[in-house]
């Protein structure tokens, strides 16, 4: 028995020492954004175009993935890390001439999610002019997805979700075609997706979720209708997403996740309540989810990094005013420099206006 006990104590001691070593690493990491590693991480994703199963399994997200990578690079002031011409060529190769939208990958059906990402990649690369004649078709494709009740479907198959509505409204804004949208009908639908707790769900009557809150608040922001929601109740719901460790979760009783640094923060920023959150603790949480060896940011510390969490971690840090990053526009999740150039930027915070 004694031998067993000693072994248990020995193992426990080793684990504690390991944890302490880990802790020192985390403390070091938790103070700086490892820009160089993250840039390399994104560049390597681009080079992984091989026959690996993982690559093909994520083909339906490829356009989104490229946007996440390109936007993160621009926010880290490393836009030149990927070849501009190759990016533009890839985006245009995903255009679906049949429907007028963009697919996630060449010869995939058009979808509103990949259509917005395609437009954003071109905007990030100052290449929207490359759309040429396609521009009108894209606007028609986006408008064709709106239903009678004001909601939007993602493609011709008909599933609706407030994410699709946000993508549609943002895409139209980027293409300067908001005047063609029935704004009031769209706003009415968004308001019907709000809940008594102040949050928003993916459709009427659905549970409040932070990602859907952003899509609704972001769309209302573009449509200049933020005065039509109960901002205080919403802000309280958003602030309650911060867990004791500093991170944010998407709804009550769930684990914290780096991507909510964006969904929650951008929403708070749009209703001018960013200061309601403990920014230092959140910043430490995001930085502690970095992979110091391979680069990239994970959903939470010790997990595997991916481009999605890298983008939203970096964007969250930008909203928190992290030094050395481009300022991000909370409405579009694009650098202010880009939305200003397109004249679609709606300045919320005085500090952004001062830049």
Identify the residue ranges that each predicted region occupies.
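Internal amphipathic alpha-helical repeat/solenoid segments
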Residues: 2-114
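Alpha-solenoid helical-repeat scaffolds
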Residues: 28, 32-35, 56-66, 81, ...
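Glycine- and aromatic-rich loop/turn segments at beta-sheet edges
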Residues: 38-57, 93-108, 142-159, 190-211, ...
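Well-ordered alpha-helical segments within folded domains of soluble proteins
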Residues: 62-73, 111-123, 161-172, 209-221, ...
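Structural helix-adjacent loops and short alpha-helical linkers that scaffold large soluble proteins
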Residues: 75-85, 124-136, 174-187, 222-235, ...
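Extended ligand-binding groove/face enriched in aromatic
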Residues: 93-171, 184
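Structured C-terminal portions of repeat-based eukaryotic scaffold domains
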Residues: 215, 219-336, 343-344
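Conserved small/polar residues in nucleotide/adenosyl-binding loops
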Residues: 348-353
């Amino acid at each position: 028995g004694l031998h067993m006990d000693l072994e248990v104590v020995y193992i426990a001691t080793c684990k504690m020492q390991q944890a302490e070593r880990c802790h020192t690493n985390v403390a070091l990491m938790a103070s700086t954004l490892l820009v160089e590693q993250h840039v390399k991480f994104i560049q390597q994703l681009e080079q992984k175009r091989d026959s690996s199963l993982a690559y093909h399994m994520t083909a339906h997200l490829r356009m989104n993935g490229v946007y996440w990578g390109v936007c993160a690079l621009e926010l880290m002031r490393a836009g030149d890390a990927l070849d501009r011409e190759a990016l533009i060529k890839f985006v245009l190769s995903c255009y679906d001439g049949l429907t007028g939208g963009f697919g996630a990958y060449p010869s995939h059906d058009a979808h509103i999610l990949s259509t917005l990402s395609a437009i954003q990649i071109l905007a990030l690369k100052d290449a929207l002019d490359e759309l040429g004649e396609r521009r009108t078709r894209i606007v028609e494709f986006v408008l064709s997805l709106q239903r009678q009740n004001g909601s939007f479907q993602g493609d011709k198959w008909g599933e609706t979700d407030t994410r699709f509505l946000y993508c549609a409204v943002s895409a139209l804004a980027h293409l300067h075609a908001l005047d063609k949208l029935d704004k009031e009908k769209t706003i009415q639908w968004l308001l019907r997706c709000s809940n008594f707790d102040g949050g928003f769900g993916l459709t009427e009557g659905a549970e409040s979720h932070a990602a859907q809150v952003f899509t609704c608040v972001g769309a209302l922001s573009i449509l200049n209708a933020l005065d039509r929601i109960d901002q205080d109740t919403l802000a309280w719901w958003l602030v309650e997403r911060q867990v004791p460790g500093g991170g944010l979760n998407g709804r009550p009783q769930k684990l914290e996740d780096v991507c909510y640094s964006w969904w929650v923060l951008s929403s708070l920023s749009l209703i001018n309540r960013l200061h309601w959150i403990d920014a230092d603790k959140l910043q430490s949480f995001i930085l502690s989810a970095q992979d110091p060896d391979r680069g990239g940011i994970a959903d939470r510390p010790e997990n595997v990094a991916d481009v999605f969490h890298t983008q939203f971690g970096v964007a969250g840090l930008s909203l928190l005013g992290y030094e050395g990053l481009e300022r991000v526009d909370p409405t579009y999740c694009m650098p202010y420099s880009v939305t200003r150039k397109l004249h679609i930027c709606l300045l919320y915070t005085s500090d952004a206006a001062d830049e």
